[in-house]
Structures are given as C-alpha cells and as structure tokens.
C-alpha cells in the first residue's frame, strides 16, 4: 500500500479471464 494505492491481490477466477460464450 505504498503511495496510497490499494494492494494488488490475485483474483479468483483471474481478472484477465472472463468466461464468455465462444463466437460462432
């Protein structure tokens, strides 16, 4: 929490992974 910034925490599921319907 340096510089008043929120601590980075691992997301479950990962933030970069968003389940979405596959394009057809």
From Swiss-Prot:
Keyword vocabulary terms for this entry: Acetylcholine receptor inhibiting toxin, Disulfide bond, Ion channel impairing toxin, Neurotoxin, Postsynaptic neurotoxin, Secreted, Toxin
The keyword Secreted appears for this protein: yes
Subcellular localization: Secreted
Biased composition (Basic and acidic residues): 1-10
Primary site of residence: secreted
Outcome reported for the amino acid change (mutating residue 11 to S): 3000-fold decrease in affinity at the alpha-epsilon site of nAChR and 4- to 9-fold decrease at the alpha-gamma and alpha-delta sites, respectively
Molecular function, one GO term: toxin activity
Highest taxon listed in the record's lineage: Eukaryota
Positions in coiled-coil regions: none
GO cellular component: extracellular region
Result for mutant: residue 5 to A: No decrease in lethality; in Waglerin-1
Paired cysteines (S-S): 11-15
PTM per Swiss-Prot/TrEMBL: Amidation of the waglerin-1 C-terminus increases the affinity by 2-fold.
Tissue: Expressed by the venom gland.
Region called Disordered, residue ranges: 1-24
Further details from the record: Exists in two forms, due to cis-trans isomerization at 13-Pro-Pro-14.
Family according to the record: Belongs to the waglerin family.
General function of this protein: Waglerin-1 selectively blocks the epsilon subunit of muscle nicotinic acetylcholine receptor (nAChR). Also has effects on rodent ionotropic GABA(A) receptors (GABR), since it potentiates I(GABA) in some neurons and depresses I(GABA) in others. In mice, it elicits tachypnea, ocular proptosis, rapid collapse and spasms, whereas no toxic effects on respiration and blood pressure are observed in rats.
Subunit structure, as described in the record: Waglerin-1 is monomeric.
Protein name from the UniProt record: Waglerin-3
């Amino acid at each position: 929490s340096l510089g008043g910034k929120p601590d980075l925490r691992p997301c479950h599921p990962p933030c970069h992974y968003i389940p979405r319907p596959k394009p057809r």
